[in-house]
Design a protein with these regions (language model features):
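Primary recognition of N-terminal secretory signal peptides and signal-anchoring hydrophobic helices
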Residues: 2-194, 226-227, 234-242, 246
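Alpha-helical scaffolding within the catalytic cores
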Residues: 234-239, 261-269, 297-302, 338-345
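Short, Lys/Arg- and Gly-enriched loop/turn segments at beta-strand edges
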Residues: 195-210
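Chitinase-like catalytic core of GlcNAc-active glycosidases
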Residues: 249-256, 286-367
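Short, solvent-exposed loop/turn elements at domain surfaces
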Residues: 168-171, 197-200, 260-267, 288-291
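Solvent-exposed, polar/charged alpha-helical surfaces in well-ordered, non-transmembrane soluble domains
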Residues: 73, 77, 127-131, 180-184, ...
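Boundary/entry segment of secreted carbohydrate-active catalytic domains
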Residues: 165, 221-268
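SH3/SH3-like beta-barrel fold
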Residues: 185, 206-212, 220
Length: 367
């Protein structure tokens, strides 16, 4: 009988030990599994993972000739909307306040091609992006898994040092897979929203998102860190100022239908029947093809008389001709450039105060 009780107690003890072991392993024992880096970063071959501020992006870049090239669509949507890709003429166009830069496939910026093409998509040089955008970047392209870190200069970046050996993990838990081993006194950089004002030390958090000097990215335990301090971003970027002209008062505009030169003679009698108008817009210019040409009924004498009557003259440009596809016209940088130059020349020739673009039927593709 006593032997039976002993066996029973032994079995109960084994069950308790097994349960305790299971609970410990499940809840408290750190994972020793390591991530597959290609799967973790979502890249392979010459693709480059993009970490922007503190987030891994779905889009990936390309490395070529020791330069990282960012996908145009992503760069414009996230970093700089002043860039324009002309797929018709394979030109990258950048608009500055006082000039427009046209970059073809041979255009070199800081020793690098401004863009490359892959699978019919455009990729923009990261160095070019940095030159014209208020960001800092750091790329790691010597390892099998390539990465580029891009962060706005307005985003906090904090450096820290490991006070003991630790692990960089794929999530905010010891059960998350290991991304990299961290050595004592190794430096890490804490990104973006992981650091908030008044919480430099991470005292309100157990884990912080960070990357290492080797380019690894993941989560590190706050308890393993010391010597946390803000990194001072040094950038030569000067944000351009895009100015505009204000009329200074409400615009009261009247259109004047002009379909031939003789119609210009009616301006004075038509204006006499109006009240409070300060701008007249004669329909002088009409696009005639997809190459930037247009018909013109402009008159210097008309403008002189209008000015004497206290009116500004804004020549109207329309796209009503059935021969014109405005989408095709606007897609080509050379045509847009020609059209702009011709309109400016006519504005100077006829002493116009402005140009009134009346392009109808534009959809999102042509906008």
């Amino acid at each position: 009988m006593k032997n039976g009780k002993r066996v029973y107690l032994f079995i109960i003890l084994l069950i308790l030990i097994s349960a305790a072991t299971y609970i410990y392993v499940t809840m408290f024992m750190p994972s020793s599994k390591r991530v597959d880096h290609s799967t973790y970063y979502g890249v392979k071959d010459k693709q480059v993972a993009i970490i922007y501020n503190d987030g891994l992006q779905k889009a990936s870049a390309i490395e070529q000739d020791k330069e990282v090239y960012l996908p145009y669509d992503w760069a414009v949507a996230i970093l700089n909307d002043k860039l324009f890709w002309d797929s018709e003429e394979n030109l990258l166009v950048y608009t500055l306040p006082e000039e427009i830069i046209y970059m073809d496939e041979n255009y070199i910026s800081d020793g690098k091609k401004a863009f490359i093409k892959s699978d019919n998509s455009a990729y923009v040089s990261a160095s070019l992006i940095k030159k014209y955008t208020n960001v800092n970047l750091r790329s790691f392209t010597d390892s099998d898994i390539r990465k580029i870190y891009i962060y706005d200069n307005s985003v906090s970046l904090v450096s820290a040092r490991l006070k003991k050996k630790s692990k960089l993990r794929s999530g905010e838990t010891i059960k998350a897979d290991i991304v990299a081993d961290l050595d004592k006194e190794e430096s890490v950089y804490i990104l973006g929203s992981s650091v908030t004002d008044g919480d430099l030390t991470g005292k309100n958090k157990k884990w912080l998102k960070a990357y290492t000097d080797k380019g690894d990215w993941g989560y590190v335990k706050v308890s393993a860190l010391e010597n946390m301090d803000y990194v001072v971003n040094i950038s030569e970027f000067v944000k351009p100022t895009y100015t505009s002209i204000s009329f200074g008062e409400p615009v009261v505009l009247g259109w004047h239908q002009v379909s031939n030169m003789d119609a210009n003679k009616n301006m004075e009698s038509l204006v006499a029947r109006t009240s409070g108008m300060n701008v007249i817009s004669p329909t002088w210019f009409s696009l005639s093809d997809n190459e930037g040409n247009y018909t013109s009924y402009a008159s210097r004498d008309y403008v002189t008389k209008a000015h004497e009557m206290g009116l500004q003259v804004w020549g109207l440009v329309d796209n009503l001709s059935k021969k014109v596809s405005t989408v095709k016209l606007l897609k080509k940088s050379s045509v847009r450039k020609l059209l702009i130059e011709k309109l400016i020349n006519d504005a100077i020739t006829y002493n116009l105060d402005g140009i009134n673009l009346d392009f109808e039927g534009l959809n999102a593709e042509g906008a």
